[in-house]
A protein has these predicted regions:
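Juxtamembrane intracellular "pre-TM" segments in multi-pass secondary transporters
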Residues: 18-23, 207-238
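Extracellular/periplasmic helix-loop-helix junction of adjacent transmembrane segments
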Residues: 51-79
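Conserved MFS/SLC helix-loop-helix module at the cytosolic interface between two early adjacent transmembrane helices
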Residues: 79-118
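Structural signature of the two symmetry-related core transmembrane helices
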Residues: 95-109, 300-315
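Paired small-residue
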Residues: 103, 107-110, 118-126, 327-333
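Helix-loop-helix hairpin linking two adjacent transmembrane segments in secondary transporters
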Residues: 119, 156-202
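Cytoplasmic helix-loop-helix junction between adjacent transmembrane helices
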Residues: 123-164
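A late C-terminal transmembrane helix in Major Facilitator Superfamily
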Residues: 350-386, 396
Length: 433
């Protein structure tokens, strides 16, 4: 499928990937559009967090039942991400994005009319089924367009713009909740999806030529999934990405309890958490883009993990010495997200680089593993830890330690494979007289 609208690729009759591989820059707005697609999932999580108390009151649901609307979203999100990439590899990037974002918009509008908590669970599941397409396909598009340092720069630009989502979403949701009630955040999500659908229809180029499309045959998909998900180096780096993010996401999931109960802020005060996190993500992404091509990937990762380790240790120390309060209870979030944003573009490229034409499917597997862990954190870990800021700090440190272990194992695996001697050719068969 060719790009529509006034893009250079559409006018020339070639795909955008052919242009950028030839050296022509991608359109100026492509980073913003890909970031907006990737941010749709976080917006679906964070926008309605300030409405949790009213949702429970209006739908006669317990706090735990309201919390499970997050799990109802995250678990289908994780499962469906396995298919978004395969569909995008077979049908093209553009078509999959358009359908998925439109379905997300309809589900969001339906959430606004829910009358029982069970209805909201079901509709949130539909949101989860469709929301992951933007995140998966946007990563594949980056690798369709660029290689090496340019890919890292574009990934860093997307991460930097994507950083606004966790900060803006609860802020917007808090103001909507104050003026219009709990249904208004879902109306906002529907309008956002409608705007994105129109923007993608007019501006998003197709970056996967028809001759590079992959099969949807079950046997082919099963063998490819098995190959990707049984590769240790892929699992190590995906585990590192997922665990690093989970250390921060634990606070996002616990935001109503952490901010409103422990720190005593109002429903419009969620910027106390998401402001430092946004600033950290922006700073780390900017640094990652600046050092691309100048600092090696291992050194970039070392700097990112150094910042995250400093933040996690400082968080433990502050919680041991001081009672919960502002600003010290949220200050470590800035350094943690800064280190995370510095590391994640490099880790993502490590995950996708080996798979060539199967990048969409590999991106699906990576997103699935991250979303599955997010679902576990939402369903089990966050409710277990959010009753104490010390427990939350310990959770962040523990998840980071596991993520650092995954990155270390990946580095050792890659180093071992690079140093291994090439396989010796087998001798030719002996001819029999």
């Amino acid at each position: 499928m060719r790009a529509r609208g006034a893009s250079p690729a559409g006018q020339a009759g070639i795909t955008m990937s052919e242009l950028t591989r030839a050296g022509t820059p991608a359109p100026r707005g492509i980073a913003f559009l890909l970031a907006a697609l990737a941010a749709l999932g976080p917006f679906a999580i964070d926008t309605y967090l300030p409405s949790f108390p009213e949702i429970g009151a209006r739908l006669a649901a317990s706090p735990l039942a309201v919390q499970q609307t997050l799990s109802a979203y995250l678990l289908p999100f994780a499962l469906m991400t396995l298919w978004h990439g395969a569909l995008a590899d077979a049908l093209g990037r553009r078509r999959v994005v358009l359908v998925a974002v439109a379905v997300f918009g309809l589900a969001s509008l339906s959430c606004a009319f829910a009358t029982r908590i069970e209805h909201l669970w079901i509709l949130r599941a539909v949101q989860g089924i469709s929301a992951g397409a933007g995140m998966v396909v946007s990563r594949a598009i980056v690798r369709d367009l660029f290689d090496g340092p340019p890919a890292q720069r574009l990934m860093a630009q997307i991460t930097m713009m994507f950083a606004f989502a966790p900060a803006l979403a609860p802020l917007i949701g808090g103001w909507l909740q104050s003026f219009f009630g709990w249904r208004s955040p879902f109306v906002f999500l529907a309008l956002l999806a409608a705007s994105l659908t129109l923007a993608c229809y007019r501006l998003l180029p197709e970056t996967l030529p028809p001759d590079k499309r992959q099969s949807l045959r079950p046997s082919y998909l099963l063998s490819t999934y098995r190959r990707v998900l049984s590769t240790p180096r892929f699992l190590y780096v995906c585990g590192a990405i997922a665990l690093n993010f989970a250390g921060f996401f634990l606070y996002v999931l616990s935001a109503p309890m952490f901010l409103m109960t422990h720190l005593g802020v109002s429903e419009t005060g969620f910027l106390w958490l998401f402001g430092p996190s946004m600033s950290g993500l922006l700073t780390g992404s900017w640094i990652s883009g600046r050092v691309a091509g100048h600092l090696s990937r291992p050194r970039t990762l070392a700097a990112g993990y150094g910042l995250m380790g400093f933040a996690a240790c400082g968080n433990l120390l502050l919680n041991a010495l001081l009672p919960p309060g502002l600003p010290w209870s949220v200050a470590p979030i800035f350094f943690y997200t800064c280190g995370m944003a510095l590391a994640v573009p490099t880790l993502t490229l490590y995950a996708l680089d080996p798979y060539g034409a199967q990048r969409g499917l590999a991106a699906s597997c990576q997103t699935f593993l991250q979303a599955a862990l997010n679902g576990i954190v939402a369903a089990a870990l966050a409710p277990l830890l959010w009753h104490s800021t010390r427990h939350l700090a310990a959770g962040m440190a523990g998840l980071l330690a596991l993520g650092a272990l995954g990155a270390l194992l990946h580095h050792r695996r890659v180093s071992a494979e690079a140093g291994a001697p090439p396989p010796q050719p087998s001798p030719p068969p002996q001819e029999t007289p």
